[in-house]
Every structure is written in C-alpha cells, then in structure tokens.
UniProtKB/Swiss-Prot annotation:
Gene3D superfamilies: ribosome modulation factor like domain. This is Ribosome modulation factor 2. During stationary phase, converts 70S ribosomes to an inactive dimeric form (100S ribosomes). Disulfide bonds: none annotated. It comes from Colwellia psychrerythraea (strain 34H / ATCC BAA-681). Pfam families: RMF. The keyword Cytoplasm applies. Belongs to the ribosome modulation factor family. The keyword Cytoplasm applies.
Length: 57
C-alpha cells in the first residue's frame, strides 16, 4: 500500500517549525503563496514559542 504525502499546507507548517527550531528568521520564509506562507509562519511562531518555553535548545 502506498503512503500518502501530507498536504502542502501541513508540510509548510512543519517546515516552518523546523526552520524556527533551527534559528532562521521569519524573513527567510521560502513560500510566495499566501496560504503556504501563513502556515509556514504559524509553524515558525510555534517553534519560537516552544524554544522560549525551554522545550528545545
């Protein structure tokens, strides 16, 4: 059985989260599409929040 890929917006959120954990700035968002960019920034904000709470170093 083939595995389904995650939808593009879910992937954008995940990529933004990883970017936030990696210390990238929000200006480094690679997406131009407004929906994908919004999801990426949401993931980025979640990661920054988690880092500030001490969940990641």
């Amino acid at each position: 059985m083939k595995r389904q890929k995650r939808d593009k917006l879910g992937r954008a959120h995940s990529n933004g989260y990883q970017a936030g954990l990696g210390g990238k700035t929000k200006e480094q968002c690679p997406y131009q599409n407004i929906d994908a960019k919004s999801q990426w920034l949401g993931g980025w904000r979640d990661a920054i929040s988690d880092r500030n709470l001490g969940l990641f170093k």
